[in-house]
Amino acid sequence: MSFVVVIPARYASTRLPGKPLADIHGKPMVQHVVEKALQSGADRVIVATDDERVQQALAACAGQAGFEVCMTSKDHQSGTERLAEVCRHYGFAADTIVVNVQGDEPLIPPVIIRQVADNLAAATAPMATLSVPIQDAEEVFNPNAVKVVTDQEGYALYFSRASIPWDRDRFAASREQIGDHYQRHIGIYAYRAGFIQRYVDWAPSALEQIEALEQLRVLWYGEKIHVAQALEAPPVGVDTQADLDKVRALLAN
């Protein structure tokens, strides 16, 4: 089964400017992500950036390492819009499976990149993603941890920053203990290329704007998202300097 990995790498991060090029043991962060994507067995790996500094930093190793760099518009409002531009640029067939791997996930396990691609290939949905079990009560009530609930076949019913499902009887007694039915969404997606353009052509939905979760647009317009439990939980991504320091320490060991 063939698939393409696209890694959006936007330079102008608010909390960590120049994030794609942050040095992690002699390599820019985005290069670590590329290496994980190559290890997943992807047919092609493409870094989609809006800044020539990222392109120049990767140019020397791209050809030899076996990945590509695609310059994209600075005007995109989301990584999915950048992904759509890449699909148009390369003229991917509508049934091409494209996996969107965030450029700030230098420790992402290659096995889950492959997993989400395989899951989409086997699913009756235009989009697939992953989740991990929540075992900490604090995380259930943390709005930064996005929860997902699915039907019996693994298709998403809803994503929310709220505590879903609400365990009425348990929480009436205490919120310190949780059941085993909570799943945290992981921000890795596989799409069929033809669907990506449909997605960006849709107007943003009320729900996605309220929750600030763009995947809700897919459910709003009546399409399915397949969700499976990740074979391996990804370690911390990089949003802040503290996250970057943590990743450096983990890789040093």
Curated annotation (Swiss-Prot):
Pathway: Nucleotide-sugar biosynthesis; CMP-3-deoxy-D-manno-octulosonate biosynthesis; CMP-3-deoxy-D-manno-octulosonate from 3-deoxy-D-manno-octulosonate and CTP: step 1/1; Bacterial outer membrane biogenesis; lipopolysaccharide biosynthesis. One of its GO terms (cellular component) is cytosol. Its main location: cytoplasm. One of its GO terms (biological process) is CMP-keto-3-deoxy-D-manno-octulosonic acid biosynthetic process. Its EC number is 2.7.7.38. GO terms for molecular function: 3-deoxy-manno-octulosonate cytidylyltransferase activity. Transmembrane segments: none annotated. HAMAP family: KdsB. Activates KDO (a required 8-carbon sugar) for incorporation into bacterial lipopolysaccharide in Gram-negative bacteria. This is 3-deoxy-manno-octulosonate cytidylyltransferase. It comes from Aeromonas hydrophila subsp. hydrophila (strain ATCC 7966 / DSM 30187 / BCRC 13018 / CCUG 14551 / JCM 1027 / KCTC 2358 / NCIMB 9240 / NCTC 8049). The gene is kdsB.
